[in-house]
């Protein structure tokens, strides 16, 4: 894709690379089938440790400034620089594996990125996990979706839902992404309570198949920045139709022998 924005805004974005503030930009996408331009999209730097890298990753938000708008059924798009992977194929292989086994996961493809006519490099375009993703992958999209990042260890903290609300000012281990007006953590609290008190009852609240697929895939790909090792990088979705929580994979740059300190 091509992104165009005022040069002053671009400089501000790179100076304040830890900010999640969206900047107005024009998005142009062209391939063998599509040649479209969208004005007034949101554009910002994204990521955690990757924000400190020379090759930044970016988030595109098609409806941030103009509500209700999407681009081929996508409201948001992650453009990942894969800064510590010289091959830029590790994450793509992981997402392809998940697609091959039929697990609900992000779609991904390689793209070239230009910002203000400057070539930024080869990137991996990864589908954002949000309410749009849920509506495409589940018959019932009215459930709660949690983004789980460090320290999302599923440790028992108490019997009440509010015990699992974000508990550090800078840390949100279980970040509710849908139905925020209700702020209901009861299904998450129920899952954690059963994990620690009556694990023989897990099948009644957790989709065991997708959980085992997730764990097996992380072992296969050598993913260590995950729930199993770092209590990090996964989503949980409660499906009201079957009253089960489903595991959704997330973030696969640290796989196949890659660590934080590799090539930038």
Language-model features: where?
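Single conserved hydrophobic/aromatic residue that forms the stacking wall/gate
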Residues: 1-11, 15
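Hydrophobic, secondary-structure "cap" segments at the distal end of domains
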Residues: 258-264
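Conserved NTP-binding catalytic cores of kinases and kinase-like/nucleotidyltransferase enzymes
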Residues: 12, 16-89, 93
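Active-site acidic catalytic loop and adjacent metal/ATP-binding pocket
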Residues: 10, 60, 204-258
């Amino acid at each position: 894709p091509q992104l165009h924005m005022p040069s002053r805004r671009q400089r501000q974005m790179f100076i304040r690379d830890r900010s999640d503030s969206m900047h107005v930009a024009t998005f142009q996408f062209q391939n063998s089938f599509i040649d479209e331009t969208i004005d007034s999209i949101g554009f910002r730097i994204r990521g955690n440790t990757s924000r400190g890298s020379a090759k930044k990753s970016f988030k595109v938000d098609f409806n941030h400034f103009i509500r209700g708008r999407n681009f081929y059924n996508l409201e948001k798009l992650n453009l990942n620089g894969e800064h510590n992977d010289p091959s830029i194929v590790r994450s793509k292989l992981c997402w392809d594996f998940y697609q091959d086994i039929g697990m609900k996961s992000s779609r991904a493809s390689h793209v070239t990125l230009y910002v203000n006519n400057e070539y930024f490099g080869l990137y991996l375009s990864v589908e954002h996990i949000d309410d749009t993703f849920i509506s495409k992958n589940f018959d019932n999209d009215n459930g709660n979706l949690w983004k789980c990042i460090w320290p999302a260890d599923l440790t028992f903290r108490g019997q009440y839902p509010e015990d699992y609300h974000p508990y550090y000012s800078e840390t949100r281990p279980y970040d509710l992404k849908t139905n925020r007006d209700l702020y209901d953590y009861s299904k998450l609290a129920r899952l954690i309570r059963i994990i620690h008190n009556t694990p023989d009852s897990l099948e009644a609240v957790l989709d065991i198949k997708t959980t085992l697929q997730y764990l097996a895939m992380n072992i296969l790909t050598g993913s260590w920045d995950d729930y199993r090792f770092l209590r990090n990088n996964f989503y949980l979705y409660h499906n009201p139709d079957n009253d089960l929580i489903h595991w959704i994979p997330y973030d696969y740059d640290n796989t196949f022998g890659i660590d934080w300190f590799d090539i930038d």
